[in-house]
Amino acid sequence: MGSLGAILKHPEDFYPLLKLKFAARHAEKQIPPEPHWAFCYSMLHKVSRSFGLVIQQLGPQLRDAVCIFYLVLRALDTVEDDTSIPTEVKVPILMAFHRHIYDKDWHFSCGTKEYKVLMDEFHHVSNAFLELGSGYQEAIEDITMRMGAGMAKFICKEVETINDYDEYCHYVAGLVGLGLSKLFHASGAEDLATDSLSNSMGLFLQKTNIIRDYLEDINEIPKSRMFWPRQIWSKYVDKLEDLKYEENSAKAVQCLNDMVTDALVHAEDCLKYMSDLRGPAIFRFCAIPQIMAIGTLALCFNNTQVFRGVVKMRRGLTAKVIDQTKTMSDVYGAFFDFSCLLKSKVDNNDPNATKTLSRLEAIQKTCKESGTLSKRKSYIIESESGHNSALIAIIFIILAILYAYLSSNLLLNKQ
């Protein structure tokens, strides 16, 4: 759960965090008994705890298909991300990955920590994949083939232009959006969304991750991963790694704001995609990550910390998003609130200020025209810095009760 300091600063986070804690425990108890499915769902919770929770929104058949789709693509991504694999070995694996998923004996040792376990024990994923319906299998195979080919292309090619950047993000994330739309359609729950809108859903998430993960990617050993397009960063520095040096802070922030402004172009498409969804479970599955993305962009914007360490939404706010996202009015409210926060951080002297403000105003206009903003729940109102002692005492009492309850349950489970 969130740290005590964070809870005292944001006491409104406590209840959503508590619900998230119990939801996580419930999700862990839902792991199927069959060894290959048990491996897949356990691995899902390890490689992405938040996705492991969000996927629980879906019905059983679709949940299984999305779980396997996610693990197959995480495995593919693990091969791409491992900079120690020689190009002549990596490219053929990426190109043939869509065939390997049919092979119960195939595995390839690479990656670290839980990703290495995923790759070493990949036969469990293949076994589970082969139990899916043919419609799900075909969709997963098609997207895996196209993504592997795209990744292979960019192993041998740098991201030079914004068009390159959009193309790379299409291969590694836009195709995920297309694949999920196909899975939703195959389940009979949704109409097939257009490729353009599906692509934007993936690009908005991927560009947010690329912006947030700048420092981790540039410091990757033995070789940096460089996804920011030269067409953007070359306006500010001579080399991409120069952005992390303190003497370049002013230029680095301008470059960062340029990248965020580029990502915002996809927000309106995302709102359109989500507004077309019919099923509440699929809606929540899609909406929660998109709200997290615009929230993360709001935190990153104009923030030098992106070049010094990790920038991410506090756990309590994440819990709040998961708890409160139920309808499209919640999404419009969240996008409106976070775009207001972004707008408040725009420096009029920033070279992209006019473009940034224009994109934010377009997002706000779409949210206002929905006619639902009066119903919105606030995501960004900061708590007062000081809270009275009675409130703090109540929180400590609740925490003590919760700790005692969880401890007693743990002892009972061990007996």
Curated annotation (Swiss-Prot):
GO:BP terms for this protein?
farnesyl diphosphate metabolic process; response to ethylene; response to hydrogen peroxide; response to jasmonic acid; response to molecule of fungal origin; response to nitric oxide; response to salicylic acid; response to vanadate(3-)
Cofactor(s) the protein needs = Mg(2+); Mn(2+)
* Chief place where the protein resides: endoplasmic reticulum
Q: Which reactions are catalysed by this chain? A: 2 (2E,6E)-farnesyl diphosphate + NADH + H(+) = squalene + 2 diphosphate + NAD(+); 2 (2E,6E)-farnesyl diphosphate + NADPH + H(+) = squalene + 2 diphosphate + NADP(+)
Residue ranges of the TM segments: 281-301, 391-411
Q: What conditions trigger expression of this protein?
A: Induced by jasmonic acid (JA) and methyl jasmonate (MeJA) in adventitious roots. Induced by chitosan (CHN). Accumulates upon Cle-mediated signaling, an elicitor derived from fungal cell walls of C.lagenarium, thus inducing the accumulation of saponins. Triggered by ethylene (ACC), rose bengal (RB), nitric oxide (NO). Accumulates in response to hydrogen peroxide (H(2)O(2)). Induced by N,N'-dicyclohexylcarbodiimide (DCCD) in a nitric oxide (NO) dependent manner thus leading to increased ginsenosides accumulation.
Q: What does this protein do?
A: Component of the triterpene saponins (e.g. ginsenosides or panaxosides) and phytosterols biosynthetic pathways. Catalyzes the biosynthesis of squalene.
Name it. Answer: Squalene synthase 1
